[in-house]
Amino acid sequence: MIELYSNAKLPTEFGLFRIYTFVNDENKDHAVIVRGDPRGKENVPLRIHSECLTGDVLGSLRCDCRDQLIQSLRYLGRQEYGMLIYLRQEGRGIGLLNKIKAYSLQDMGADTVEANLKLGLPVDSRNYSFAAEVLRYFEIKSIYIMTNNPEKIKSLIESGINVKGRIPIFSDPTPYDKFYLETKKTKLGHEIENI
């Protein structure tokens, strides 16, 4: 169950949005960035973005998170309506402390999957049930999801969300994230077309 906590206008370089904050049963706060009025609409463009302090905020080149976030906000800013659900699930759900431990193992040659497993952690422990609850809160009838991750789509469908299609996100690989993106494609099944 989720509870709306607050909302306010959010002017950005990508356009005017509204930010909503919700609290879930685990007392975790999540943000929903809304463009226009998607309530009760069909074919709503949606991005579900998991928190990434190193990429989103610090501009790390180890991942493509910031690219995906910026591309999504830019895309949504050109739409009549749409949503970005920002989930507090740092490091595919393992948290910031463990994510930095995993980075250390990656510095020694492990890929992102191997690093999590060496730490005794799940490869991906994210949960998208909160996102499904948000979509129900806004009475969204159907979505087009901006993602390369088929597990997100599967999870939403299993939660009863009508997913009409996928909007791919393209990132130009850098020397720092090429191995990471290749691993996401080969080991996690991400649909990354330019790797």
Swiss-Prot record:
Textual note on the cofactor: Binds 1 zinc ion per subunit.
Active site: 124, 126
Catalytic activity: GTP + 4 H2O = 2,5-diamino-6-hydroxy-4-(5-phosphoribosylamino)-pyrimidine + formate + 2 phosphate + 3 H(+)
Positions annotated to bind GTP: 47-51, 68, 90-92, 112, 147, 152
GO BP: any one term: riboflavin biosynthetic process
Organism: Thermoplasma volcanium (strain ATCC 51530 / DSM 4299 / JCM 9571 / NBRC 15438 / GSS1)
Enzyme class: hydrolase
Domain of life: Archaea
Name used for this protein in its record: GTP cyclohydrolase-2
Documented EC number(s): 3.5.4.25
One family name in Pfam for this protein: GTP_cyclohydro2
One GO CC annotation: cytosol
Family in the record: Belongs to the GTP cyclohydrolase II family.
